[in-house]
């Protein structure tokens, strides 16, 4: 018989640096999950990723307090900021432009995000990433 799922926990944790401090500790502790076991497993799974990149993770907690987790790709905003070489997006994206990205960079980001995105083909995913870039105040160049 399959184990009963008691909770799904969604977090964003920096790759390779999960520790029991907030937000990880309290989120897992209230569901009775072994926090250190998760931290060790998460850090081992994300050691190949760029250290410090925010990594979304979905943790499935079962009735016997065991867990499984699935890591996702970093957020598009993080990848766009890295590609444009900026610290943060524009507060007024319609008026103030803070950087530029090329279509080639957008295609690279879309390929990275492909497992987590919905869309008919790569071109549709590139358009989605381009929309995120424009909403951050980035100019998309050909």
UniProtKB/Swiss-Prot annotation:
Any Pfam family from its record, for instance, is Ribosomal_L11
Q: Which GO terms describe its cellular component?
A: cytosolic large ribosomal subunit
Task: State the protein's purpose.
Answer: Forms part of the ribosomal stalk which helps the ribosome interact with GTP-bound translation factors.
Subunit structure and binding partners? Part of the ribosomal stalk of the 50S ribosomal subunit. Interacts with L10 and the large rRNA to form the base of the stalk. L10 forms an elongated spine to which L12 dimers bind in a sequential fashion forming a multimeric L10(L12)X complex.
* Family listed: Belongs to the universal ribosomal protein uL11 family.
Q: Cite the InterPro entries for this sequence.
A: Ribosomal_uL11 (IPR000911), Ribosomal_uL11_bac-typ (IPR006519), Ribosomal_uL11_C (IPR020783), Ribosomal_uL11_C_sf (IPR036769), Ribosomal_uL11_CS (IPR020785), Ribosomal_uL11_N (IPR020784), Ribosomal_uL11_N_sf (IPR036796)
HAMAP family the UniProt entry points to: Ribosomal_uL11
* Gene from which the chain derives: rplK
Q: Might you name a Gene Ontology BP term for this protein? A: translation
Name by which UniProt lists this protein: Large ribosomal subunit protein uL11
Keywords from the UniProt entry: Methylation, Ribonucleoprotein, Ribosomal protein, RNA-binding, rRNA-binding
Description of post-translational modifications: One or more lysine residues are methylated.
Superkingdom in the source lineage = Bacteria
* MF annotations from Gene Ontology: large ribosomal subunit rRNA binding; structural constituent of ribosome
Q: Which PANTHER family match?
A: 60S RIBOSOMAL PROTEIN L12, LARGE RIBOSOMAL SUBUNIT PROTEIN UL11M
Q: Which SUPFAM superfamilies match?
A: Ribosomal L11/L12e N-terminal domain, Ribosomal protein L11, C-terminal domain
Q: Which NCBIfam families match?
A: L11_bact
UniProt-listed PROSITE patterns:
RIBOSOMAL_L11 (PS00359)
């Amino acid at each position: 018989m399959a184990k009963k799922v008691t909770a799904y926990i969604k977090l964003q944790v920096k790759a390779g640096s999960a520790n029991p401090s907030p937000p990880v500790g309290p989120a897992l502790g209230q569901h009775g999950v072994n926090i250190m076991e998760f931290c060790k497993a998460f850090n081992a799974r994300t050691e190949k990723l760029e250290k410090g990149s925010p990594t979304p993770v979905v943790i499935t907690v079962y009735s016997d307090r065991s867990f499984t987790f699935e890591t996702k790709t970093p957020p598009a905003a993080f990848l766009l900021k890295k590609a444009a070489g900026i610290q943060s997006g524009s507060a007024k994206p319609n008026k103030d432009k803070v950087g530029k990205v090329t279509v080639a960079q957008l295609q690279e980001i879309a390929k990275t995000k492909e497992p987590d995105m919905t869309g008919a083909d790569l071109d549709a995913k590139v358009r989605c990433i381009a929309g995120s870039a424009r909403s951050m105040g980035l100019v998309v160049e050909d």
